[in-house]
Design a protein with these regions (language model features):
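Oxyanion-binding "anion nests"
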Residues: 214-258
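Short polybasic amphipathic segments
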Residues: 183-186, 245, 255, 337-347
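Short, glycine-/Ser/Thr-/acidic-enriched flexible segments
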Residues: 33-34, 98-100, 138, 200, ...
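Internal helix-turn-beta structural module
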Residues: 295-360
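Charge-rich, low-complexity intrinsically disordered segments
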Residues: 228, 240, 246, 350-361
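Short, solvent-exposed amphipathic alpha-helical segments in soluble enzyme
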Residues: 42-48, 201-202, 245-248, 271-274, ...
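Active-site bordering "gate/hinge" segments
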Residues: 1-227
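Dual-mode signal for accessory low-complexity, basic/Gly-rich regions
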Residues: 256-321
Length: 361
């Protein structure tokens, strides 16, 4: 095992957050060999607690091979072993290594079909297990974005290992205040989006599920999202590039989408099902220890000074009712001087700076 003690601390954090105890059935998915150090530490911790770990190892390159060669029907069918594992497990943990994307864009129709099949598995995960998704940095991704690997790794551990009880209490106070407001407005260059949160609940995410963690989130009212929002630069979804995405909303629905690259995939995702054009989640990053914008959604959505919307499935815990096989988080960086986030009349992000209860302690 790697001698860095932070891997052991991470394993303890995951086991605590998912409630692993004597007799717990723990399903573990791993998607990249570079995540195996984290997997080994966690499997050891599960055994130490008397749990029963079972590991399914795969690789994102296998998914790419499927998109290239499998039939659309096969792509859209949930993987039977993964489905059985979800139904067996009390706890599910996925260790997803940040693999380098393919050199060429994959067929958007086939890629969207694959995401439909995977959406069934992810729905089972949050409905039937206590779960955690862990996005593990790799040297490949560090090279891709031009950042030293040790920098990514240090921010990863800082964003995973924390006194989450204290963090949850602090952000819980902010959520209580936000629950008294009815509207959210996101403003930046070529962005002015208003969302209603009337009757919905803000909740904290503090070490229980996704790691790295640190956000507050709610589910906007389904038919009350209006305006437009842009996402400059490149973001990644299932290994596919989407560049300079712009979405326009009317009465809760995406009515127009443009991008300088990847628009075919965006349009296919929007047609996933009846709920995929609606915003299922509005999130605000709260983790001041993560500062590097990586292009990876699971990490960037935690950065203090960012907001994100998720097209598709809503979290019932927030009062959301939108159903979809899709849950696509898209991160907006508001840390520049034109970035503002208003909840009611108060600015939580003012000219790129987190203010009030959102400001770092």
């Amino acid at each position: 095992m790697n001698t860095d003690p932070r891997w052991i601390s991470l394993a303890t954090q995951i086991a605590n957050g998912t409630g692993v105890t004597d007799g717990s059935k723990v399903g573990i998915f791993v998607t990249d060999v570079q995540a195996m150090t984290a997997v080994e530490a966690f499997v050891t911790e599960v055994y130490r607690r008397g749990g029963i770990p079972q590991v399914i190892a795969s690789d994102e390159r296998f998914d790419r091979a499927a998109v290239e060669h499998a039939s659309v029907d096969v792509l859209a069918t949930p993987a039977p072993l993964e489905e059985a594992a979800m139904r067996w497990a009390d706890v599910h943990v996925s260790f997803r290594g940040m693999a380098s994307p393919p050199k060429e864009q994959q067929d958007p129709v086939r890629l969207a079909a694959q995401r439909r099949g995977k959406g069934v598995i992810s729905t089972l995960r949050w409905q039937e297990t206590r779960w955690s998704l862990v996005r593990v940095p790799t040297s490949e991704w560090a090279e891709l974005i031009g950042v030293p690997y040790e920098t990514l790794l240090d921010e990863f551990f800082a964003g995973c290992i924390a006194d989450w009880g204290t963090v949850a209490a602090r952000w819980g106070r902010l959520c209580e205040e936000l629950n008294t407001e009815d509207t959210v407005r996101i403003v930046s260059d070529d962005t002015d989006l208003t969302l209603s949160t009337r009757g919905r609940t803000w909740i904290t995410f503090a070490g229980e599920a996704n790691l790295p963690d640190g956000e507050i989130a709610t589910a906007p009212v389904d038919d009350a999202v209006d305006g437009h929002i842009t996402f400059p630069g490149t973001l990644w979804f299932a290994g596919a590039r989407v560049t300079d995405l712009r979405l326009e909303f009317e009465r809760g629905l995406v009515v127009n989408a443009t991008a300088s690259e990847g628009i075919e995939l965006v349009n296919e995702l929007l047609e996933t099902d009846g709920g995929s054009r609606r915003v299922g989640e509005l999130g605000v990053g709260t983790n001041a220890k993560i500062t590097t914008f990586t292009g990876d959604l699971l990490i960037d959505e935690k950065i203090l000074g960012t907001v994100h919307i998720a097209l598709g499935r809503a979290y019932p815990a927030c009062g959301g009712v939108n159903e979809s096989a899709l849950h696509w988080d898209i991160v907006k960086d508001l840390r520049g001087p034109s970035g503002y986030l208003y909840v009611g009349e108060q600015a939580l992000i003012d000219g790129g700076r987190a203010t009030g209860l959102l400001a770092p302690a």
